């Protein structure tokens, strides 16, 4: 879905920065509950047009409890405590990722599992992932006026059941290019069948907890059952709550299940032609939740359906990825992208994200010259700076302040604002390294800065993970001039490596970067992506000049240590998520335990069917 500028089923086989970065923020207004579901009317799978002959794998057959009328594995064995939590999203790192959504669904679930919860993540199978096994379970799902067959693939890693929905609309489009073409053939261009693709995801996700017999977890056996919390993520999963209320709960299925809806980026909403609503196969009572009118002419002019709007209204709880972003979303049309009034009614809770501290660890990083921790950072970062200067082809001198920019080259991240500020910095004794890929116009823009200032600026416009790690270790300041930033990961990675950030004062950057302690704030930049505001250029340049003057001083060294002495892991955010989800009151839910995550390279992660 291009960013905004301002079932039926048949189954067969305001200060800048806050001290407590992990504390959630709830913004509740009038307690609006959305549309009320119909009262459950008893029934079973047959009234859903569901017939079952799901075939278990040989390993599953050895451990299945027989005797269930509906499914051979319907009995849930739980020797652990906690909740049954099912995350659903279009991305799941490291298997698929274009941004923060993939990182969250890759990192938060293992932290939840470490606390004793049974956790599943469901996402499309965009590639032939070598560690995902065919469960031999298939489902025929109705989309529009036809049935489409999907298969369920599975792997169990880091305490989490990873489930992949296999269908040609996912695999054929993206195969081999997972990071580039999940949503469309080119940046900003959508596949025409995205509604069908993600309707399949939503409906298949509702079947998975009931029919997949998963026995890898030493504490849980069998299916997840029906007492689950679904955590939907962004517009691609907007209809899931409606399908739950339309297809299951009136038939006595998932009576106690609840849905939390998490907004990762309000700019992508899933807006489609109003005439497409019947293709969702939902009753008329849900039409108003999707109904939307805006002033844009894409995909059609005037009246539309809006998947994110429906996800917000039909969910039992609405969340987003940082407290300050939650405040911005309800502040007005510009930052709420015309859904601000809806969120003021439903209320919204902000929980800041964590990061993968095992992948980004300067004490063990194989890509950097000198490994270090908070006690050795100052000298080690100087050595890494020299290595970075040599790698980039810049004059090697550890005394020259080095500013870095790493990010997707699109309007949100402000590469055009950064480029416009570079000439204002050239009178300073400074070096600048730019790394990113994205829209061609921005790639050309950054390369033009290198051509104009060859002795001071280097631009690398291709994916280069080793260089990204070396930049984090060698840069003195990380520039993050985002027009808006729901949470942001880049600043967490920078601070993990002891690199203070000079950032715009928006979203999660406000919650995670503290002025004068772990970084420098530029103030809020304009969200108008069509122009580069001169006032924004001045803010970026002035803040970077201020940061340059601090580099090399005792105050700067204290900032480096402050950055590295933080706990930026998922541990705190996972506990906050637990508290919110427990509040939904799903039957059998209980608080978790204090546990440690399974390491990525642990023997428990060996793939097995």
Curated annotation (Swiss-Prot):
Record-given protein name: Granule-bound starch synthase 1, chloroplastic/amyloplastic
NCBIfam families, per database record: glgA
Keyword Amino-acid biosynthesis: no
Keyword Glycosyltransferase among record annotations: yes
Family statement: Belongs to the glycosyltransferase 1 family. Bacterial/plant glycogen synthase subfamily.
Polar residues biased stretches: 46-66
GO biological-process terms attached to the record: starch biosynthetic process; starch metabolic process
